[in-house]
Design a protein with these regions (language model features):
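Extended assembly-interface regions of large multimeric machines
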Residues: 1, 74-101, 369
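Beta-propeller and closely related beta-pinwheel folds
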Residues: 76-89, 121-292, 334
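Short loop/turn segments that connect beta-strands within the blades of beta-propeller domains
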Residues: 33, 99, 107-109, 145-146, ...
Length: 497
């Protein structure tokens, strides 16, 4: 290479190597010859680097002899540039709570801050680190009504981050968030849990704090002097999947574990779930477990878990349990692709509020070592469609019944279930919608044999409007399943009682 723009008399744009098969061949990459760095954009014939640009990354162009050593520096960074790596860490989640007029906030595995809203200049005052408090903790909760600030997965020696123990609990003196050293005259104290390798999260319940490790559930109850709190194990093999994967409603806690869905209301129960295989066969529990979050929609008695699928690094799916309509023998579950990274119930704003992370939208600033993206803020249960930055998107929904067939026998007042021996004819469908906006689509899926693939009736699917009194179906099969759905914008419906 000569000491000119391309090294070949000013006209060449390529460099020939003895072997370039191990060099990156797509995108903009870099090599180093002597002290000069050169970029290139392609590799041809296994030996030729094309699209070269000399003297990049602040280096100086120089002449190089044939046979000079060429080093691939595509993964190198220049002085002052940010470097990236493949280290996987837990996300920097926050724990938030109130201590009277003070807002308490803890960054995961970090320090705890306070912000006093009662100050006359509160809106002009930054939050400050709480003095005397632990400096590295996984989670934090304010215990009520006794008013202790409790840290989970915290330091055994206050102020020494290297002593952080993921199973260690420390709580402050009553009414004093600056005092954590136990003495004969205060109620501060500590406790280490035994079942599990780390405390995943905690949530305040009606009469206790539910403390979850990765394998078990503990109940932390205020008992007064001399122990301040009691700790009792309430379950095993029921650990919490992620810090925010639990909600409490009406004295019962519901959470998602690596071993299924659970409920605690005085005793541990495994929630019967009709979609458990569907969820757990396609969920990212490796790097995505801390992204799992639970949301409560008490307007409709729904508990939702938002989670990343097995091939996704961001939340992209949802599973929902309806505790209003469920019974032990008939649990009500739904699944979907609603992706929310935060959910706040209607108790605060009157309607649920939630956040949606969009990895495909660039930020206005550079992000190094992670994906760029933006977050949209939604108010739910408003209207019929999704309105994101003025763009209207239909909220589609569907429900399909199980197959039903004709009852063929009746003996002494007992009706026996049909076994598909007879064909049945359905002449018409009479809509029974409690409420309906826009059009709804009805499909009759027909089968003549158990192994048949369900197919729509020849005249279907049928479009039902609010003024439709009946539709003639002229369908015939041994087994029929009813599917109700909406696919367009401005549509919603409620079927039955």
């Amino acid at each position: 290479l000569g000491d000119n723009a391309f090294g070949t008399g000013g006209s060449g744009t390529s460099i020939v190597l003895a072997d370039a098969s191990q060099f990156p061949s797509s995108g903009t990459n870099f090599i180093k010859v002597g002290t000069e760095e050169i970029s290139y954009t392609g590799v041809t014939s296994g030996t030729t680097l094309t699209g070269i640009t000399r003297a990049v990354r602040g280096t100086t162009r120089a002449a190089h002899s044939d046979g000079a050593t060429v080093t691939n520096t595509s993964d190198f960074v220049a002085w002052g540039e940010a470097a990236s790596g493949d280290l996987v860490l837990e996300p920097g989640m926050w724990s938030l709570d109130n201590f009277g007029d003070k807002a308490i906030s803890l960054i995961h595995d970090g320090e705890v801050f306070e912000w006093d809203s009662s100050l006359s200049n509160a809106t002009d005052t930054r939050c400050t680190i709480i003095s005397g408090a632990p400096t590295a903790s996984r989670h934090m909760v304010v215990s009520t009504p006794d008013r202790h600030l409790v840290f989970f997965g915290t330091e055994t020696t206050i102020g020494t981050k290297s002593t952080q123990d993921d199973m260690f609990i420390r709580f402050s003196d009553q009414e004093n968030i600056n005092s954590y050293t136990p003495t004969a005259t205060n109620t501060a104290g500590t406790q280490r849990l035994a079942d599990g390798s780390q405390i995943m999260g905690a949530i305040r319940g009606r009469d206790s704090i539910y403390v979850y490790t990765d394998t078990a559930l503990f109940l932390m109850r205020f008992v007064g002097s001399p122990f301040t709190f009691s700790f009792a194990q309430a379950g095993t093999n029921c650990g919490l999947s992620g810090q925010n994967a639990v909600v409490e409603v009406d004295g019962a806690a519901y959470w998602l574990s690596e071993n299924g869905f659970f409920r605690y209301a005085g005793k541990l129960e495994s929630l019967p779930c009709l979609v458990e295989d569907f969820v757990f066969d396609d969920i990212n529990m490796e790097s995505g477990n801390q992204m799992i979050s639970a949301g409560l929609n008490n307007l409709f008695g729904e508990i939702m878990w938002f989670y990343p699928s097995s091939t996704s690094s961001v939340v992209n799916k949802m599973v929902c349990y309806n505790y209003f309509d469920s019974t032990p023998n008939r649990p009500v579950w739904t699944v979907g692709t609603l992706d929310r990274t935060m959910w706040k119930d209607s108790a605060v704003f009157g309607k649920p509020h939630a956040l949606d992370y969009d990895a495909g939208t660039d930020t206005s600033f550079d992000v190094v070592g992670n994906t760029e993206g933006r977050t949209a803020y939604y108010e739910h249960e408003t209207g019929t469609d999704q309105n994101k930055n003025g763009t209207i998107t239909a909220v589609t929904a569907n429900i399909t019944s199980g197959d039903f067939d004709i009852t063929q026998d009746r003996n002494q007042g007992i009706t026996f279930r049909g076994d598909g021996e007879f064909l049945m004819k359905i002449r018409r469908f009479i809509p029974d919608f409690v409420s309906q906006t826009g059009n709804t689509q009805i499909t009759l899926n027909l089968k003549n044999y158990s192994n048949d693939t369900a197919a729509s009736s020849s005249l279907g699917p049928f479009t039902i409007s609010s003024s439709t009194t009946k539709v003639d179906t002229r369908a015939r099969a041994r087994a029929i399943a009813l599917k109700v759905e909406n696919t367009g914008s401005g549509q919603d419906w409620k079927l039955g009682t």
